[in-house]
Amino acid sequence: MLELLSKEVLQRRVFNPYYYDLHVKEFMLGQTKDHIDSEGTVLDIGAAVGQYSKFFAINSGHVYAYEAVPPVYEQLCKIKNDHLNFSAYNIAISDKVGKDKFYVDGQRLSNSSFQNLVDGFPIDVEVSTIDKQHENANNICFIKIDTEGTELDVLNGAKKTIDKHDPHLMIEIYPKFNKYPVDTTFKFCFDRGYTCFYNHRGRGLKPVKDIEHGVKIALTMPEITDGDFLFLNGNRA
């Protein structure tokens, strides 16, 4: 089925300097710089074509990026041309290890997921966990997760890594696609002592007081937050 994707669809998922600059200036991405260790490791889960990976590579010691859809992964690998501190993997990250069905958004390639969100077509993908992939890693300082509704599965497969490294987290929480109740991701992070912020476009970071407040922001302000939340770990300087 992948070979049937049109050139028009494939062209929609290429690195775009305009959108890169926009996300650095106005979205959560630009707010992450102060929370990335210049010598640390960043994990980009659901990396797409690498617009966030590029920013992380500029500001960290090394980036490990994961993208499940092969033609999107091919675009992601081009980041390596400019950033030697970058590694890409054609693996879907979740809470298990093995093989599974993954649904490709054949119209835009942007809403591909373990969930069939947009009448996609299935492909078989390799699946792993953050804990498995990075059990021997040093100084994982930041993890970004954008997996179209399965972010909690990624977190559940990263518990050992989170406990060991105390990374800051950037997580998409988009109720329309969430596999689980909206409060569950907030609870996972708040239970581990994280403080939470959203990016009010044009105004900067604003605090999320508690789980209930986070759910309200996620449900009512997606156009302002772009669905992204920043969770800061107080144990990391």
Language-model segments: residues:
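Phosphate/nucleotide-binding beta-alpha loop and adjacent structural elements of enzyme active sites
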Residues: 1-237
